[in-house]
């Protein structure tokens, strides 16, 4: 049986935050699922919903999102990469996130010997 930490160890620490990801890596999960999308300024952030307080997530600057406890995908790769736990990335929102995701994965996969990254998403036409 494969144990996937949905949005990290979310039942213990909440969704898509660094503490839930690090705990999932240490608690015997086989994989971490997380949601990625773009901020207003084009950074890849880790957040599930497309709205935050009734506003589209892409209306928020990175600084505003960081103040709300939302982390960047790059920070997650930096911290989780050395654990070598596989990641399951769920792409949300604009497909432009794929280009930035690939750029960041190229930056972190080799140094951390990350072997398994799974990507899913859908785009309504």
Regions found by a protein language model. Give the residues of each.
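Phosphate-group recognition and catalysis centered on beta-loop-alpha active-site segments
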Residues: 1-125
